[in-house]
Regions:
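Glycine-rich, acidic loop regions that bind phosphate or pyrophosphate groups
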Residues: 4-6, 123-165, 186, 270-377, ...
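Thiamine diphosphate
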Residues: 48-128, 130-137, 291-294, 299-311, 338-341, 349, 424-502, ...
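Conserved thiamine diphosphate
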Residues: 87-90, 136-175, 299-300, 346, ...
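Conformationally flexible catalytic loops at phosphate/diphosphate-handling active centers
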Residues: 171-232, 386-387, 589-591
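Phosphate/pyrophosphate-binding active-site segments
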Residues: 2-18, 159, 206-210, 214, ...
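Glycine-rich, anion-gripping cofactor-binding loops and their flanking helix/strand elements
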Residues: 86, 242-329, 423, 433-463, ...
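Active-site diphosphate/adenylate-binding microenvironment
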Residues: 24-28, 32, 45, 50-54, ...
C-alpha cells in the first residue's frame, strides 16, 4: 500500500496542536495519546533521540508516566510486548535501535503475525542520506520485516511521522490484528516540526475495507440459512480459535454454546475462550488435543468454525478432518481464510463477536432443537477417553505437577509457556476459566517465548498471578530475562520442568526415528538453573526431586511474595499424549498406554515410520 495523503478527522483540538516538537517528541506524544503506559525496549545509537524524548517526557509529566522496561535483548522486548498485548488486549509496544536491534526483533514480529497479535515496533534507522551505504548498524528493515509483519513503514518524509505512528496503531488493532513496524531514520527523529495532534495516513481502498468489516452484520437470510443447516444436523460442534479471544467474543461464544447446547472444542490459541470447566467444553483439539475432543470432531455432522483457520496442527489430513460433517460453517474476520483449507457450506466475513451475536439473536427468536442425546454422548466420550498418565511411577510426572498446580490456581492464573512438551502438558492439564489467561507461541512455536511473555503479562496485569511453565531447552533461549524479573521486582513465578533435553523432538525421535536421539540429549550440559536464578536475585530459588513434596513445595512457590523460581526434575521419558502424527488423521491418533483409545489398531510408540513418505509437518 502507498500512502496518498494525511486524512484529518474532526475531533476536539489537541491541547498541544501547533506546538513545535522534534520528531522523537512527536513519537512519544502519539504513544501517550494512544494510551501506551509501557514501552519494552533496548537503546542504541540510532534510536537515542527517542529514548531521550522518553526521559524528557517523564520530567515534564509527573502524573502521566510511560514505564520503560529494559530487557536482556531485543527479542525479549518483543515477546514482552506480545505478552502484554495477549493478556490485556491492548497494543504492545517495543522500541529498538537499528541494525542488530532490528534484526533481533524479527522473530517476535513474525510470531505476532502468525498468531495475530497487535504490537507496534518502532526502530531507529541510520540517517536518510546514509541508507544504502552499508553504514554502521544499518539493516534493510523494510525489506526484512515486510515478509513478517502486517505492515512496515520507512519514514522518508518527516512531515508524515506523526500520522505514520498513529496509523501504525490503527492498523495493528484493526480487522485481523498483527504487528506493524515503523522504521525511523535518526535525522527524522531529530527533525523539528509542528505537532498536529490528529491525522492518519490515507491508503486507497483501505479505509473502505475497514469500515465495511466494522459494519458487517449477518443478514436475516444468512441467519435463516445457518439455522436451516443446524436444524438438519444431529451432532453440531463449535471449533473456536484465537480469533474469538482477539475479538473479545468469549461471552458470545459461551452464550451461543449454552443457549443451543452445542459442545465446543478450541485450538491451542483458543483456550480460555470457553471456560474449560464448563460442561459444553471439550477443551483442545488437534495434534496433542484431548482424545475425546478429537473423537467429537470425527463424529460431528455440523462443524461451526469461529475465528479459526484449519491449520495443519488441527486439520492434519484435511480430507479426513471432520469426515462426517455434512455442513461446515466458518466465521472469520479475514476473508482469505474462508475456504483456504476446508470447503465450507456457510460463511460470514466479519467480527466474531458480531457474527455470533447476530446468530444468537436470530436463533433465540425461532430456533428450537434438542441436542441432548449428542451432548450425553459427548459427555461419555469425556469419561471414557479422559486425559491420563502413569500415576504409579516413582519418578515425578509432569502431568502430576500441573494437576497439583491447577488445584492451587483453579483456572484463575495467567499461564505462559515456552514451546515443547511442557507447553502441551500445560495446555492439557490446566483449567482456564477466562480468555487472555493462556499465552503461548502457537503457529511459530518459538522456544524462549514463555519467560519474556510472562514479564509482559505481569506488567499489564500487576494484580494477577502470572506463572511461566517452561522447559530447560526453551528457558535457555531467553534465560537472561530472569534478571529483568528481579530488576523490576515483578512477582512472576517461573516453573521449570527439567527433563534434561529437548523433550518434544526427542519424543518424535522415539516414535518415528527408532530412538536415534540426535542433538536432543542435554544431560551432559552443566547449567545449574537454580544458581543462575539466585545470581539474578531470586530469593525463592529451589530444585525439587522428590515426588512426595510436590504439592507442598508448589504451594510455597505460588504463595511466595515476589519473584519465585522452581525447578522440578521430571521423568525424562514422559511423553505427550494423545498425538496425531505427521500426515495422519484423527483415526490414527496415538493415545499412549494410559488414555483409552476407541481403536487399538493405530501405530504405537516404537513403530518406525518412514518419514520420507509422509508430509513434512514438523
Amino acid at each position: 500500500m502507498t500512502a496518498q495523503k494525511i486524512t484529518q478527522h474532526p475531533t476536539a483540538r489537541h491541547p498541544l496542536a501547533g506546538k513545535s516538537m522534534s520528531g522523537a517528541e512527536m513519537i512519544i506524544q502519539v504513544l501517550a495519546d494512544e494510551g501506551v503506559d509501557t514501552i519494552f525496549g533496548y537503546s542504541g545509537g540510532a534510536i537515542l533521540p527517542t529514548y531521550d524524548a522518553i526521559f524528557r517526557y517523564h520530567a515534564a509529566h509527573d502524573g502521566r508516566q510511560i514505564r520503560l522496561i529494559v530487557p536482556a535483548n531485543e527479542q525479549g522486548a518483543g515477546f514482552m510486548a506480545a505478552g502484554y498485548a495477549r493478556s490485556s488486549g491492548k497494543v504492545g509496544v517495543f522500541l529498538v535501535t537499528s541494525g542488530p536491534g532490528a534484526t533481533n526483533s524479527v522473530t517476535p514480529i513474525r510470531d505476532c503475525m502468525a498468531d495475530s497479535i497487535p504490537v507496534v515496533l518502532i526502530c531507529g534507522q541510520v540517517p536518510r542520506h546514509a541508507i544504502g551505504t552499508d553504514a554502521f548498524q544499518e539493516a534493510p528493515v523494510f525489506n526484512i520485516m515486510s515478509a513478517c509483519a502486517k505492515h512496515v513503514f520507512l519514514v522518508h518524509n518527516p512531515e508524515e511521522l506523526e500520522a505514520t505512528v498513529r496509523t501504525a496503531f490503527d492498523m495493528a488493532r484493526s480487522a485481523r490484528p498483527g504487528p506493524v513496524v515503523v522504521d525511523v531514520p535518526k535525522d527524522v527523529q531529530n527533525w523539528t516540526g509542528v505537532f498536529k495532534g490528529e491525522g492518519l495516513l490515507h491508503f486507497r481502498g483501505y479505509e473502505a475495507r475497514m469500515q465495511a468489516l466494522k459494519a458487517a452484520r449477518v443478514p436475516e437470510e444468512k441467519c435463516a440459512a445457518f439455522f436451516d443447516q443446524l436444524g438438519k444436523s444431529e451432532r453440531p460442534l463449535i471449533y473456536a480459535g484465537g480469533g474469538v479471544i482477539n475479538s473479545d467474543a468469549s461471552g458470545e461464544l459461551r452464550s451461543f454454546a449454552g443457549t443451543f447446547r452445542i459442545p465446543v472444542v478450541t485450538t491451542l490459541l483458543g483456550i480460555g475462550a470457553m471456560d474449560t470447566t464448563h460442561e459444553m467444553s471439550l477443551h483442545m483439539l488437534g495434534m496433542h488435543g484431548m482424545a475425546y475432543a478429537n473423537y467429537a470432531v470425527e463424529d460431528c455432522d455440523f462443524l461451526i468454525a469461529v475465528g479459526s483457520r484449519f491449520d495443519d496442527r488441527v486439520a492434519g489430513k484435511v480430507h479426513e478432518f471432520a469426515p462426517r460433517a455434512r455442513f461446515v460453517a466458518h466465521i472469520d474476520i479475514d476473508a482469505a481464510e474462508i475456504g483456504k483449507v476446508k470447503n465450507v457450506t456457510w460463511s460470514f466475513v466479519g467480527d466474531a463477536r458480531t457474527g455470533l451475536g447476530d446468530l444468537l439473536a436470530a436463533g433465540r427468536k425461532s430456533f428450537k432443537k434438542d441436542f441432548s442425546q449428542w451432548v450425553a454422548y459427548v459427555q461419555q466420550l469425556k469419561k471414557k477417553h479422559a486425559r491420563n498418565y502413569d500415576r504409579e511411577s516413582r519418578l515425578i510426572q509432569p502431568q502430576y505437577v500441573i494437576e497439583c498446580l491447577n488445584e492451587i490456581t483453579r483456572g484463575e492464573a495467567i499461564v505462559t509457556s515456552g514451546v515443547g512438551q511442557h507447553q502441551m502438558w500445560a495446555a492439557q492439564y490446566f483449567d482456564f476459566k477466562h480468555p487472555r489467561t493462556w499465552l503461548t507461541s502457537g503457529s511459530m512455536g518459538t522456544m524462549g517465548f514463555g519467560l519474556p511473555a510472562a514479564i509482559g503479562a505481569q506488567v499489564a496485569c500487576p494484580d494477577r498471578l502470572v506463572i511461566d511453565v517452561d522447559g530447560d531447552g526453551s528457558l535457555r533461549m531467553n534465560l537472561g530475562e530472569l534478571e529483568t524479573v528481579t530488576t523490576y521486582n515483578l512477582p512472576v513465578k517461573v516453573l521449570l520442568l527439567n527433563n534434561l533435553g529437548d523433550g518434544m523432538v526427542r519424543q518424535w525421535q522415539k516414535m518415528y526415528f527408532n530412538n536415534r536421539f540426535s542433538g536432543t540429549d542435554k544431560s551432559l550440559h552443566s547449567k545449574d538453573f537454580v544458581k543462575a536464578a539466585e545470581a539474578d536475585g531470586f530469593l525463592f530459588a529451589a530444585r525439587l526431586t522428590e515426588n512426595e513434596k510436590v504439592q507442598e513445595v508448589l504451594r510455597e512457590f505460588v504463595e511466595f511474595k515476589g519473584p519465585a523460581f522452581l525447578e522440578i526434575m521430571i521423568d525424562q521419558d514422559a511423553c505427550v499424549y494423545p498425538m496425531v502424527g505427521p500426515g495422519m488423521g484423527y483415526k490414527d491418533m496415538v493415545t499412549g498406554d494410559f488414555i483409552r483409545s476407541r481403536d487399538s489398531e493405530t501405530c504405537r510408540p516404537g513403530d518406525e515410520v518412514d518419514m520420507t513418505k509422509v508430509p513434512d509437518l514438523f
